[in-house]
């Protein structure tokens, strides 16, 4: 049942100056001019987490042309733009209503540089119906209702913001068309990668360095990227037209150079190139195949029966590496597990930086092989497997190295970053490498790994159990005080992705883990559900949290694999 806005105002007058819990009587939906306002959740007191409300606008009234949301990528870009615009409008009214605690707060997601699907704004792909989800601190004096201040928010502030930020007729049509065009061009580039046998594309003129270690905005006066002529590719984009940049081919690409010359900066841009970026970011035309996974050592991580025998065998403690278990993995075993788990997600591109890798996992030079006999070393280093992965499995690698030249022998393409500019030194490096002994690649006797891990549902997640889950920024998720450490998942771009990972862990534990299907099968099913319904699968009682951003399936896998309570 939908009530009128006057019904809401009358109710607010009736409960004015009552104890704060009386605000719960306002839950429901109310028709305002041009939209429906739903009060979905009411906070318990003015100092608790804010109340959740949603705004619903019919597509015919919102008036956005179908061309602006004709594809999923365009729709997500439009939603992202609407959130930004609405956030700018409500910021003017934030805490204008007064009271105790969180009284007067009006807040919505604040998107960063990446364009992510978010629960804060969803648009129906069929009819353009629009839903905005936000948080409001219901005002109080102490713990007594101050409904006059809430009336200001709901009847004075929000209607102005809705009118100015959510109806097409009041927005800059040219700006929205630019958002659509960029999304279409980015999608075109992503599809061209496969067609041209490329792993990534970096447009000339891109600005890769960021403003600071705590800011993802582009560095002012950053040196624009220029492709080496030998790797230049020109794409004819649907809207931008011809665009030239560096195409990184499939295979093994090595990025070398002196310290501070831009090696890691390029790799960092590539690892976040799995997402589209907003115009003006400097990386809007840095596009990496979207299944790429950044690999690193992760000392101390939990590993639950992952088959790492592709890299590690015959451990002196007789641990079974075909089903390796550890609550405190070493650098090499953690990096081996990270590679295998990335391949389990279906990734065909591994991104590796020497600085964050376990040396004994990456290389083993000739002198060490002479001193420590091969049959005394349980680790088969990555350098001995990387060519087989590329040639036999179609799995490419992009590696950054600054201290060891061992990978010159196996690399297909070698780039040197020189004062932030890439130089193709493949021929020169290969010739120089001839004077040094090469490491012989080795092919495995069978498949890369056995991915038949069957997950048992954890009783702690049963609806009748008291479950304490808490998201701790970008670092971790606490499950009954047991932390899932996410600090090494460098491709997570937004805190709201962590919120979504927390909700998705609950979802798979309660609905998908059945003690019969493998993790791979369950993740395939989850991926299909997310592709079809998006974050709506996480709605409870018809209500979707306003602070979720879509993670990739690769990060969902990674989160589950790091859950120490995982039962296999």
Name each region found by the language model.
Residues 342-386, 390-391, 403-409, 413-430:
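Conserved P-loop NTPase nucleotide-binding/switch module
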Residues 167-223, 293-296, 300, 318-324, ...:
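Long, charge-dense accessory insertions within large macromolecular proteins
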Residues 310-332, 364-379:
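Flexible beta-alpha connector loops of hexameric P-loop NTPases
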Residues 243-275:
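Glycine-rich phosphate-binding P-loop
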Residues 391-394, 400-568:
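Conserved NTP phosphate-binding and transfer environment spanning the P-loop NTPase/kinase superfamily
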Residues 209-244, 279, 287-292, 296-303, ...:
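N-terminal pre-Walker A segment at the start of P-loop NTPase domains
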Residues 330-342:
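Conserved alpha-helical scaffold flanking the Walker A/P-loop in AAA+ ATPase domains
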Residues 1-188, 193-197, 208, 568:
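N-terminal accessory targeting/assembly segments
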């Amino acid at each position: 049942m939908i009530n009128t806005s006057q019904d809401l105002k009358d109710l607010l007058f009736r409960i004015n100056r009552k104890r704060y819990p009386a605000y719960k009587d306002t839950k429901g939906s109310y028709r305002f001019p041009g939209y429906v306002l739903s009060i979905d959740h009411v906070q318990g007191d003015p100092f608790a987490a804010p109340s959740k409300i949603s705004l619903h606008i019919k597509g015919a009234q919102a008036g956005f042309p179908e061309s602006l949301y004709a594809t999923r990528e365009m729709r997500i870009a439009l939603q992202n733009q609407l959130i930004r615009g609405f956030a700018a409008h409500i910021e003017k009214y934030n805490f204008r209503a007064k009271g105790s605690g969180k009284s007067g707060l009006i807040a919505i997601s604040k998107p960063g540089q990446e364009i992510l699907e978010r629960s804060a704004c969803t648009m129906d792909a069929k009819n353009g119906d629009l839903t905005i989800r936000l948080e409001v601190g219901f005002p109080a004096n102490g713990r007594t209702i101050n409904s006059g201040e809430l009336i200001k928010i709901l009847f004075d502030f929000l209607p102005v913001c809705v009118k100015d930020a959510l109806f097409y007729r009041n927005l800059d049509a040219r700006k929205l068309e630019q958002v659509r065009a960029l999304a279409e061009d980015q999608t075109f580039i992503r599809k061209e990668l496969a067609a041209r046998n490329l792993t990534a594309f970096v447009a000339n003129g891109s600005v890769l360095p960021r403003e600071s270690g705590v800011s993802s905005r582009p560095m002012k006066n950053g040196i624009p990227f220029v492709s080496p002529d030998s790797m230049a590719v020109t794409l004819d984009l649907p809207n931008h037209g011809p665009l030239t940049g560096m195409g990184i081919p499939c295979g093994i690409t090595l990025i070398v150079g002196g310290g501070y010359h831009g090696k890691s900066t390029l790799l960092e841009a590539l690892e976040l190139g799995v997402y589209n970026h907003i115009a003006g970011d400097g990386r809007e035309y840095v596009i990496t195949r979207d299944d790429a996974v950044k690999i690193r050592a992760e000392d101390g991580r939990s590993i639950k029966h992952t088959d790492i025998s592709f890299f590690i065998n015959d451990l002196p403690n007789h641990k079974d590496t075909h089903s390796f278990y550890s609550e405190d993995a070493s650098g090499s075993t953690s990096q081996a597990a990270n590679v295998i788990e990335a391949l389990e997600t279906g990734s065909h591109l591994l991104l590796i930086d020497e600085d964050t890798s376990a040396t004994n996992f990456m290389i083993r030079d000739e002198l060490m092989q002479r001193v420590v006999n091969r049959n005394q070393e349980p680790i088969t280093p990555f350098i001995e497997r990387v060519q087989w992965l590329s040639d036999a499995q179609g799995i490419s690698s992009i590696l950054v190295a600054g201290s060891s030249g061992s990978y010159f022998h196996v690399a297909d393409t070698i780039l040197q970053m020189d004062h932030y500019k890439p130089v193709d030194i493949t021929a020169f490096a290969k010739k120089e490498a001839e004077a040094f002994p090469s490491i012989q690649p080795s092919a495995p006797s069978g498949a890369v790994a056995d991915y038949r891990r069957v997950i048992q549902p954890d009783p702690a997640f049963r609806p009748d159990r008291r479950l304490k889950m808490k998201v701790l920024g970008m670092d971790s998720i606490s499950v009954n005080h047991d932390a899932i450490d996410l600090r090494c998942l460098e491709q997570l771009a937004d805190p709201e992705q962590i919120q979504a990972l927390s909700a998705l862990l609950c979802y798979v534990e309660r609905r998908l883990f059945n003690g019969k299907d493998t993790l791979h099968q369950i993740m395939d099913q989850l991926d299909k559900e997310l592709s079809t319904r998006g974050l709506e699968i996480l709605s409870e009682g018809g209500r979707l949290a306003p602070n979720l951003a879509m993670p990739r399936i690769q990060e969902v896998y990674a989160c589950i694999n790091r859950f120490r309570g995982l039962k296999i």
